Amino acid sequence: MSAIWGIVDFCSGQTDTQRKNRAGSLKEEALRMRQAYGTSCLDRIQEKTQEEYYLACGVQNVTREAKEEAFPYEKSEKNGEGGSLFVADVILDNRRELAQRFVSRRDLCSHPDGEILYESFCRQPRETLAVARGAYACAYLEPGKQLTLFNDAVGNRSVYYFREGKRVYFSTLLAGISCERETWEENTGWFERFFAIRDLRAVSEPRETPYAGILRLAPGEIAVFTEEGVRRSDYWDPFAGRKLLQGKTEAEYRELVTTVFRHCVEDVIREGRNGIKTGILLSGGLDSNAVAGYAAPFLAARGKKLYSFTAVPEEKERSRIPGQYAVEDERRSVELVRSFHGNLEPEYLVTNRGDLLAENRRLRELLEAPHKAVLNLPWMYECYRRAAEKGCGILLSGQYGNITISYGDFRSLFLTLLHQRRWRSLVQEINAYSRKYHRSRKWIWRDLLTAEAGQDHEAVARYMYDKSALRQIGEYEVKLSLATGVVPRDPTRDKRLIALVLSLPPEQFTHAGQERRLVRQYLRGKIPEEILADEFHKGRQGVGSRELLIAQWERICEALPETLEEAMTGENGLTRAGMVRGFYVGLAQEYRRRFEV
């Protein structure tokens, strides 16, 4: 993996003096851009500067092939003029497929990821975008003609860009562009939406940033810049031509789901130099356990361990309170996984220590934008740091799994059957649910008949490919990766899995009194049975952070004056959710003051 940045000047038809002046200013801007990456965990920087462009790539030697990258890759036309150049922040999941399908060179299979993607894109750009899988953001330059920026379909990586006059600036880090001016105008709409959303979503659209004029590639987007302007388009839409896979047997559905998901997990695990290891953010939940269920055996077959990182409270084994759904200490679940797989080496991170205000201020600068996950991001960042210290190059997770591999919701199924007027199936499903969970049938029917529109399976399916959510997750992961040198990979948001879950009938996710069936039924034998069978508890990571917030509340309010007012929620007064909101609003208002002149 890596970071990319650069400047392209489309100015033409000038005198020699004017060209020299522009080339001189471009070199000065290039130097400032390079300095913006001074604190990033990069193994080396490769760059090229000409009068009309500057292209750079900071490489991280995470995979075995990364050390052989030679950016920018370059081709000349037969007459020695024109040609193209290419820089990429890339790790491919289907290297061999691209090399053999589009390049027809078997020897290329051993070459670096960036070279494979470049050779493939040069020959068949549209087909390459349709087939390529992995985490990547790329810049393809045809000097004097156009600059093309594109990223992977699910936004694992991306790039910011800004156009001023005839110049285009692009950068993996926002600082690579913001460093080119002393003052910027704020994007008022971005802040208004940030404050208006009452949950932990920081963004509601996939392109805008806090800086007016600076945009970011949305997941699965391609942007083409010329002297005249820019053309943007989406190259992957899993909803286009979507059809449900009806009529298969239960065994066929199981085989389809397990085969696709196994490939999603195994394809992101790469061999690294110098014994680079594979880690995982592991809880007692189904998402990360689904990933571990395939990652651990895959690594064990190669004589390797899987290193897990879990946030826990300081006091060991907080007892489960009878009737309480949330489990505050997930050590017990992780130890079950360790016994089950044999090659898991867990590490526990205590979350009720530290200075929440100082940590979130530091994270705000690292993420280059206000964030809302003020309780979770500090311990997640610590997991990345610990993974780096342990020598992990890849850090697996199951962040997107709730809406893909482990999705399932009774109410959504009931409403779907109701809207489809499938009365017999609806009665059977309600009866099964009522018997298992001891819920009144009358209460269930009343709830369904008074439910608002937009809550059935079709409505939920729209979130299976949610560009705003994918952008937010990917944006945080890229910044944490550049700060620590660890590359995050989440198989639960592989585009193959997203396309698959969008094609499955609603009953595959929830049926006969059981929800989240893709994991609970189809992954039996891959996850400890005690975890699969426990439908009445859910792990709660970062419990100690909540306790820290209460203990440090007065000091936070003194440092951030807007915090207390925002935290007061009407008649309810001061609630924990209100405290979280007050905290992130106070941090965002403090960040916003940098735009004041």
Each language-model region and where it sits:
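PAPS-dependent sulfotransferase catalytic core
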Residues: 409-410, 527-584
